[in-house]
């Protein structure tokens, strides 16, 4: 699934296209919402609790629908304060981006039902692709500084029943910290540590050998996924997120 940095840069572009007053007034809360489904990294909750999508279900799912089904108090954006409405809009963007990635890229290319069969190498290839997409979208330092500043200055006056405010404040620190560390390849082995360990890639020498192979692995991964599939995913997911966010805030 897209890394936190990519979720925020995509959310920024969606905000520029939508020009919604609630988002413009509360950019920090909005960017926080765009990362918060991954708060389970902090809380250790089950993924489905915050993504409203079960990875073990292979029938069609709609995370945004489940969000409002389980949290009906959030359905009416006009009844919420601007920060909460902006937060939920960002949250919607994350759910859509993840859901489309799972269904359009991970499962058909890397998952159990794919030719790669969901093995450890497939999951490393998936992480390599995610990292590269994040790296490309975060090359503009001015854009990243803008997002980081909005996040850091947000009052986090957000009220959602399924996540406490103190947890959101702690998560905000983590989100800001993510943007403080550019996604350079030297950092990849730390971010993908458990996947490398599962493949038996451990120790300084083992990691060094693997990192030397990353450029070739990235090329192989992009060839397998296909440029068109990547482009269609990014444009299609953004279009769906934009539509659902507009419906929510209108």
Regions found by a protein language model. Give the residues of each.
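N-terminal leader/auxiliary helical segments
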Residues: 1-250
């Amino acid at each position: 699934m897209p890394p936190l940095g990519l979720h925020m840069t995509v959310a920024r572009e969606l905000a520029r296209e939508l020009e919604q007053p609630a988002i413009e007034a509360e950019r920090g809360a909005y960017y926080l919402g765009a990362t918060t489904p991954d708060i389970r990294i902090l809380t250790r909750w089950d993924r489905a609790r915050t993504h409203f999508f079960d990875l073990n279900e292979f029938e069609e799912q709609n995370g945004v629908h489940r969000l409002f089904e389980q949290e009906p108090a959030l359905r009416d954006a006009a009844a919420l304060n601007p920060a909460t409405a902006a937060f939920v809009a960002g949250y919607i963007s994350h759910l859509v981006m993840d859901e489309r990635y799972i269904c359009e890229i991970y499962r058909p290319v890397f998952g159990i039902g794919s030719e790669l069969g969901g093995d450890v190498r497939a999951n490393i290839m998936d992480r390599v692709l995610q990292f590269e997409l994040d790296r490309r979208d975060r090359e503009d330092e001015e854009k990243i500084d803008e997002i980081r500043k909005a996040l850091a200055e947000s009052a986090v006056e957000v009220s959602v029943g399924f996540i406490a405010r103190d947890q959101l404040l702690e998560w905000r620190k983590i989100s800001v910290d993510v943007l403080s560390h550019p996604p350079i390849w030297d950092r990849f082995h730390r971010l993908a540590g458990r996947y490398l360990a599962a493949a038996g890639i451990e120790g300084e020498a083992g990691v060094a050998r693997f990192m030397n192979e990353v450029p070739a692995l990235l090329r192989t991964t992009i060839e397998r996924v296909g440029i068109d599939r990547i482009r269609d995913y990014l444009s299609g997911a953004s279009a769906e997120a934009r539509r659902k966010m507009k419906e929510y805030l209108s």
